[in-house]
Each structure stands twice: as structure tokens, then as C-alpha cells.
């Protein structure tokens, strides 16, 4: 069949004018087209993106499609603004398919203005369990889930904005000594159980520690403010920008404003009363925040499905630091 990208985007945007939770039915061939075309672009762009401000940065979405549309209403629909998303598009919410399809469609339509990084949920071993596989199988088939897996294995994993703001989904890594280590990661790749790529997608800051400690998630590490400070100094950077953790106001600073956590799914999972946030970076690298207040509780886009909040992960033992 002839695939019309603009028609796909138009249909994906229709729920803007309907009630939250309305499903968008794309043809399976259209979704496969999105995964294949986007993969080609990801592979042809660097795994460590070098981007320029102005840009808007968003944290976890987790299938809360109506909230993704609200973010675009606030920030301007592409190509009105440049965007960088920090991962975790799927799982937990009810509309992972619409969410990832719109993001891939915009990536194909505006490859130099619209960027998405890999989160720890863009990984088959995680999204097999936490909702995305079930959604693909229920609405289409498990082969389509495999097509997304192949696409996710090619996503970029970090970005640097104007040589000053270092962005990733999770956090820093004790193995990260220079940026070329990231550039040398070859794709397609699965997320390993430990090491640099794992940490970029899984690590968390912790205000109660110094240095590195094992992470309660059972994967990767936590790191103290001292780690952030010395990392920024060494690499002549100003800010680490990451996602991966629910924060009450949608954004939260750490280490004397040298690290910021962004989370863009308000009322996360139907169980939290958090706001969502998007960070705007202007040409002078001034950062400002747009807040999505928690919407009313009757919203249909969140659903707990009784899934635990922190995914345990079957893994080999990682080396001690």
C-alpha cells in the first residue's frame, strides 16, 4: 500500500479534539513503515547527538498519549519548536502505540528538528513485561512488537546541547571517561546488564551519598552530587539533564542546580499526584519550565494494570566499583 506520512500524522492528532483515551487505528503496514523509516534515520545520525538551542526537552511519557498532545499544545507542534525527548515512551500507560507512532512520525517528517533518545523501557526485556508487548499483541500482533524492538535497538542514547548540556535518560556512569566511548557504541544493540550503556539508561542521582553506590533498582548505580560536579568540571559542561524518576513538580534540581530531572507524565500511572514538565532552552542556554498540572482524576490515559513500579531485572552480577 502507498504510505502517506502526513495522513498518519493527521490521524494521530485527531484525539486533540476528542475525549482523552480515544484510540487511533493505523494500518499495520503504516506502523511498520514508521519503524523502518525511523530506524534508517537513527542509524544515519550519531548515537551521541550534538544539538543546538533553542530546543524543548521532555522526560518520560509512558504511553500517556493525551499528555504528549498537551505537551505539544504548550510547546508548539513540530516544526514550530525543536524537541528532544529523553526516553520511556512505552509501558504503563494505555496508549503506548499512539505515543511511539507520533514520535517516530515526527522524527521522519522533521529529522533535523526532532530527536528522541532511548530510555530503559525501549528495551525488549522490560517492555515485554510492563505493558507494551501486551498492547501490541492485543491491538495488532507480537510480530509488530518485534519490529519496534529492532527500531529501539538503534535509538541514540545521549545528546549534548551547544557543548554545555549533557542529556540522557538515566544518569552518569563510573565507566564514562570521555564522550568517544559513547560514540563507539555500535548499533543495533540490546541494553546490557551493566556497563556504560546500561548506566546511561538506568542510573540515578542520590542526595544522601557521595561517590557511587549500588542502585536499589537492582540495576546500575546511584551517584552523589560530588560525582556530578567533578564530571561537569572535567568535561567543561554546565548541566546534566535526565529523566527516569517521578518528581512531584515535573522537574527537580540536584547538586546545586548542576543536574535536573524531567518527568513529563502527570498523574503518573494513575497513582501519583505529580505534575509533568518540559524544559525550554533558549539561544543563551537559559532554561525555563512549562508545567502540565495533574489533570482531573477521571482521565482515561493512565492505568496501573497492577504492575509494580520499579522493574526488577534478571541480570548477571555487575562488577563492583
Swiss-Prot record:
Residues 298-321 are annotated as: Disordered. It comes from the Eukaryota. Binds 2 manganese ions per subunit. CDD domains: MPP_PP1_PPKL. Transmembrane segments: none annotated. One of its GO terms (molecular function) is protein serine/threonine phosphatase activity. Inhibited by okadaic acid, tautomycin and calyculin A. Inhibited by phosphatase inhibitor 2 (dpiA). Disulfide bonds: none annotated. Its EC number is 3.1.3.16. Mn(2+) 2 binds at residues 88, 120, 169, 244. Changing residue 269 to C: Five-fold increase in phosphatase activity, decreased binding efficiency to dpiA and reduced sensitivity to dpiA inhibition. Mn(2+) 1 binds at residues 60, 62, 88. The active site is at residue 121. Interacts with dpiA. Protein phosphatase activity in vitro. Belongs to the PPP phosphatase family. This is Serine/threonine-protein phosphatase PP1.
Amino acid at each position: 500500500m502507498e504510505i502517506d506520512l502526513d495522513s498518519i500524522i493527521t490521524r494521530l492528532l485527531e484525539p486533540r479534539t476528542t475525549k482523552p483515551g480515544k484510540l487511533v487505528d493505523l494500518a499495520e503496514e503504516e506502523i511498520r513503515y514508521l519503524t523502518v523509516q525511523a530506524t534508517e534515520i537513527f542509524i544515519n545520525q550519531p548515537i551521541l547527538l550534538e544539538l543546538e538551542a533553542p530546543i524543548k526537552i521532555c522526560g518520560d511519557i509512558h504511553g500517556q498519549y493525551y499528555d504528549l498532545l498537551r505537551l505539544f499544545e504548550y510547546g508548539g507542534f513540530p516544526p514550530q519548536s525543536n524537541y528532544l525527548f529523553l526516553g520511556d515512551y512505552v509501558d504503563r500507560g494505555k496508549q503506548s502505540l499512539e505515543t511511539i507512532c507520533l514520535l517516530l512520525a515526527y522524527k521522519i517528517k522533521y529529522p533535523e528538528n526532532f530527536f528522541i533518545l532511548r530510555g530503559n523501557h525501549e528495551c525488549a526485556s522490560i517492555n515485554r513485561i510492563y505493558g507494551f508487548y501486551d498492547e501490541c499483541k492485543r491491538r495488532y500482533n507480537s510480530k509488530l512488537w518485534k519490529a519496534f524492538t529492532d527500531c529501539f535497538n538503534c535509538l541514540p542514547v545521549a545528546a549534548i546541547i551547544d557543548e554545555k548540556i549533557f542529556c540522557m535518560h538515566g544518569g552518569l556512569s563510573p565507566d564514562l571517561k570521555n564522550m568517544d566511548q559513547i560514540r563507539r557504541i555500535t548499533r543495533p544493540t540490546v541494553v546490557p546488564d551493566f556497563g556504560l550503556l546500561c548506566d546511561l539508561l538506568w542510573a540515578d542521582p542520590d542526595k544522601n551519598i557521595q561517590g557511587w553506590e549500588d542502585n536499589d533498582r537492582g540495576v546500575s548505580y546511584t551517584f552523589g552530587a560530588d560525582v556530578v560536579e567533578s564530571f561537569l568540571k572535567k568535561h567543561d559542561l554546565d548541566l546534566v539533564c535526565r529523566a527516569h524518576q517521578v518528581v512531584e513538580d515535573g522537574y527537580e534540581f540536584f547538586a546545586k542546580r548542576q543536574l535536573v530531572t524531567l518527568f513529563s507524565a502527570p498523574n503518573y500511572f494513575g497513582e501519583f499526584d505529580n505534575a509533568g514538565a518540559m524544559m525550554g532552552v533558549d539561544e543563551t542556554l537559559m532554561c525555563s519550565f512549562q508545567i502540565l498540572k495533574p489533570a482531573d482524576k477521571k482521565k482515561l490515559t493512565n492505568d496501573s494494570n497492577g504492575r509494580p513500579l520499579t522493574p526488577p531485572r534478571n541480570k548477571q552480577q555487575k562488577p563492583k566499583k
